[in-house]
Each structure stands twice: as C-alpha cells, then as structure tokens.
Amino acid sequence: MRKQKMLFLCTQNSARSQMAEGFLRELAGDRFEAYSAGCEVGNEIHPYAVEVMNEVGIDISDQYPKGLRTYMGKMGFNYSIIVCARAERNCPKTFPGVCTRLVWIFEDPRGEDVPEEERLENCWRVRDQIELKIKNWLEHPEEELAKLKAERERERQERLRAARRARELRSELEEVPAPTRWPRPTAHHGVFVAPG
C-alpha cells in the first residue's frame, strides 16, 4: 500500500511541528511519510524539544528547521496540519499539492512570556498533547475529517449569508430616492436708489 504524506506546519519549524513529525514517523511510519516545515525558518530545533522526545525514545536530533519553499511545487501531500495559532494566521490557507488541511493548535512551549524555568515543563506537556492527538487521529481519522467537513460547511453558510446580506443592502440602496436637488441660488443685481 502506498504511504500517505503528511506535512506538519508551525511558525519556525523548531519545536511543535518537529515533535509531531517525530511521533508520526515512530507511531505510523509504515503508513505515513512525515514531514514538517515553518512559515519562517528557525535557526535550530529547540534543545528542549530534542530532550523531551528523547525521554520517550524518539530521536529527532537529526531533524532540522525547513521553510515551506522546501516543498512548494516539489511534492504533494495528502494532509497538511497546522499546529500553532501564528502559523494558522500566516501560512497560506491553500498549499499547492495538499488534499486536506487540518488545524491542531498547541500552545508555544517556549513563548516569550514563559519564564525559562517553566519552558521544559511546558515542552513535556505539549509533547504529551501532540502524542495523544496523533494517536487519536490514527485510531479515528474519520472523526477529524467529519469535524473538518462540518467546519467547511459552516464557513460556506457564513459566506452565503454574507453574500445574501450584501445583495439586500445593494437592493435597499437602489430603492432610496435620489436626493432632491434644489435650484442653485442666483445672484440678483439690483440698483439701489437713495430716497430723495
């Protein structure tokens, strides 16, 4: 059976998407080819991401940050999965060669407002969330696809409502009578005659 290709996307491809790539390769490498990329390209995989993955027996130290251009126009994917909110805003909504786009948002374990002493603990938590999400998806992909279908239908209905409202507003504007144009005042030049 031909393997399906899955691309995980985050902002810099330095933590969440790298962990997701490692988990998918480990859990279902016989069924999927796992890849990851970022909207931007980070300098390196975050050391904590490598550390917490090593703790569960998955070595991602050979992986490295890659940008979307690495794959654009060169490879098709069955799935692209956005794993962070910033990437959802900044990555293209459509990606050439992608059949299905999913959104699984995980918090940034190394966020700027997170104290250094909490970042490793956050990496553990996010790692476990990613593992659980991938395991659930592998066991019940139809549920995720049903949610996606329902979400797309909601978006379609919202677009239809917006288009209908725009038509109604145009129609209402056409029914409004044009403003009455008053004649322009004309200057009267009279001759003043002083009483005599």
PLM feature segments, named:
Residues 150-175:
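Long, low-complexity, compositionally biased polyampholytic IDRs enriched for Lys/Glu and Gln/Arg
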Residues 78:
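Conserved acidic residues
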Residues 14, 85-88:
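Short glycine-rich anion-binding loops that position phosphate/pyrophosphate groups of nucleotides
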Residues 1-71:
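Conserved active-site segments centered on acidic
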Residues 174-196:
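Long, low-complexity, intrinsically disordered segments
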Residues 82-83, 103:
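Redox-cofactor binding/interface segments in oxidoreductases and associated redox assembly factors
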Residues 90-156:
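Phosphate-binding/catalytic loops
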Residues 74-75:
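A short, aliphatic-rich alpha-helical micro-motif
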